[in-house]
């Protein structure tokens, strides 16, 4: 040991770290707005709207609601004035060119990401991680959704998309094209407060954001049975009756398509994702898994490249357990447990720089079907003699 004379201080870096759930409701919307102020919404660039309706209005400087973004974003804001990111793309000479611009890609000369691909730059530009994704007015196009879903998988985001068509059969046919657990499909379109048709996904996205930011609900709750604002009705009549498995709303839900019903106001109606694995059939369960996994991976950044010592293992496990316990207390899970399995962490694996942590969890069940049974009895007839 080198010679020292005096008092020398140091800081012990061991110990449990807090785990915090980041914003679960930050959305990115890709779309067109040819009359937008280009100084505020430059084409191909992610732009943050921090709950500012005045900035949102600059998507439509001419006031004619041209493009897919103005009405779509207005319907989102009818549900919740929120921080949200918009990526404006140029309209093409025809629909095919517009769709190509929306799908985007990487400019081979500049390396600039464009269209849907630019979603990957959102966190670097805005400082906020995307959690919810959609494409205004074009999510019913198979090519667009095919490009969007891999981005959602990479970022662990939920996708809001619409079914095309004017019939139940057309909507279901589109649904059959997909088997992704992070996808929720909607049908039909909604008539907004100006009696203009707007994709249902706009209203659903706004409801999801509003629900996520309400401490009584949060990311583990379903948007189903939530009233929507700024709407006059649906493009086509969607009949609904409690207990009727043959009404259109039930048939849509049975095919994992969320709709809107009239039941003391217009309400979102449907809980299910498009997952091909029944384990992930509920949208809320997918979101709990994604949000908790993100909380843990973000919360363990301090542990990267540390020496794997006993205190390291203890601190990592306890930090994660504390984070899980916090989400349980908040009502987002029934229970959860973290552990380090010695069998997965043999000496040769640790020396090679690997450490494996496991955790389990149980998300809340969703009361999708409430069963009420009546019992006819004579037992109370003797009340006439009391």
What positions do the PLM features span?
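A glycine- and small-residue-enriched flexible loop/hinge signal that marks low-structured segments
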Residues: 2-53, 77, 107-298, 337, ...
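N-terminal assembly/attachment segments of tailed bacteriophage virion structural proteins
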Residues: 42-91
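Catalytic cores of large soluble enzymes that bind and process phosphate-bearing ligands
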Residues: 61-65, 111-114, 140, 280, ...
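Acidic/glycine-enriched edge-of-secondary-structure segments
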Residues: 80-115
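Intrinsically disordered, low-complexity acidic/polar segments
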Residues: 95, 142, 366-370
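Acidic, low-complexity glycine/serine/threonine-rich segments
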Residues: 281-343
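C-terminal edge-of-domain segments
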Residues: 345-386
């Amino acid at each position: 040991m080198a010679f020292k004379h005096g008092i020398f201080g140091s800081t012990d870096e061991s110990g449990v770290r807090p785990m915090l759930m980041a914003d679960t409701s930050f959305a990115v919307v890709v779309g067109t707005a040819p009359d937008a102020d280009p100084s505020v919404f430059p084409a191909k660039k992610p732009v943050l709207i921090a709950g500012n309706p005045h900035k949102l209005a600059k998507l439509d400087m001419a006031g004619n609601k041209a493009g897919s973004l103005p009405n779509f974003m207005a319907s989102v804001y009818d549900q919740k004035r929120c921080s949200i990111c918009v990526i404006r793309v140029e309209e093409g000479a025809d629909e095919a060119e517009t769709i190509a611009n929306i799908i985007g890609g990487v400019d081979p000369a500049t390396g600039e990401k464009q269209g849907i691909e630019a979603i990957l730059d959102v966190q670097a530009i805005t400082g906020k991680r995307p959690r919810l994704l959609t494409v205004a007015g074009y999510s019913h196009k198979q090519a667009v959704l095919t490009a969007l879903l891999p981005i959602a998988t990479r970022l662990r985001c939920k996708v809001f998309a619409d079914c095309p068509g004017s019939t139940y059969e057309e909507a279901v046919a589109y649904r059959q094209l997909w088997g992704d657990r992070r996808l929720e499909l909607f049908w039909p379109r909604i008539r907004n407060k100006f009696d203009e048709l707007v994709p249902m996904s706009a209203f659903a996205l706004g409801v999801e954001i509003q629900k996520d930011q309400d401490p009584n609900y949060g990311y583990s709750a379903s948007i189903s049975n939530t009233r929507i604002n700024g709407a006059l009705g649906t493009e086509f009549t969607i009949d609904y009756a409690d207990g009727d498995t043959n009404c259109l709303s039930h048939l849509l839900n049975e095919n994992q398509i969320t709709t809107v019903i009239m039941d003391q106001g217009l309400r979102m109606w449907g809980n299910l994702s498009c997952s091909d694995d029944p384990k992930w059939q509920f949208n809320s369960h997918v979101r709990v898994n994604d949000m908790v996994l993100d909380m843990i991976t973000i919360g363990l950044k301090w542990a990267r490249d540390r020496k794997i010592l006993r205190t390291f293992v203890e601190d990592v496990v306890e930090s994660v357990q504390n984070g899980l316990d916090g989400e349980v207390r908040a009502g987002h899970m029934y229970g959860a447990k973290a552990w380090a399995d010695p069998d997965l962490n043999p000496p040769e694996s640790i020396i090679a720089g690997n450490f494996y942590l496991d955790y389990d969890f149980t998300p809340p069940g969703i009361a999708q079907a409430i069963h009420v049974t009546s019992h006819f009895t004579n037992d109370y007839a003797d009340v006439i003699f009391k």
